Amino acid sequence: MPARESIIWNVNLSIEKREALSRYEPATGKWSAWRAPGDEPRVYAVYVDETDKVWVSEWTAQAMLRFDPKTEKFEAFRSSTGRPNVRQIHGRKGEVWTPESATDKIVVYRY
């Protein structure tokens, strides 16, 4: 995998409900995509932490997803606050911060 500075991560929102996490490598022009787990995933925000794990908010499962690009696996962290509706993800070393627009709370995930 190329150096993290040369990778662009994004989430694809679509009316066809084919939401996916995507990676673009400008040096090669290559796109890769991974469908979020679940029957009808609704991905929204994306954040890459300092260990190169990719965090994605997922509305249908009411969870934060952590994607490992090396194993290409998602890990889900379910919300205990109901429908969190995370629209942004912020972080600092060892933490991911998720402001929940539906609950007016900030949830911190430590790893």
Summary of predicted features, one role per range:
Residues 7-18, 54-59, 98-102:
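Conserved beta-strand positions in repeat-built beta-propeller and related beta-rich domains
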Residues 19-23, 62-66, 105-107:
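A short loop-to-beta-strand structural motif that recurs across blades of beta-propeller domains
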Residues 55-57, 66, 76-78, 89-90, ...:
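Conserved active-site loop/cleft motifs that coordinate metal ions or position small ligands
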Residues 1-10, 39-53, 82-94:
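Beta-rich, blade/repeat-based domains predominating
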Residues 18, 28, 51, 60-61, ...:
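Surface-exposed loop/turn positions within WD40 beta-propeller blades
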Residues 25-29, 68-72, 110-111:
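Short loop/turn segments that connect beta-strands within beta-propeller blades
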Residues 30-36, 73-78:
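A short beta-strand motif characteristic of beta-propeller blades
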Residues 83-111:
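Blade-level signature of beta-propeller repeat domains, shared across WD40, Kelch, NHL, RCC1
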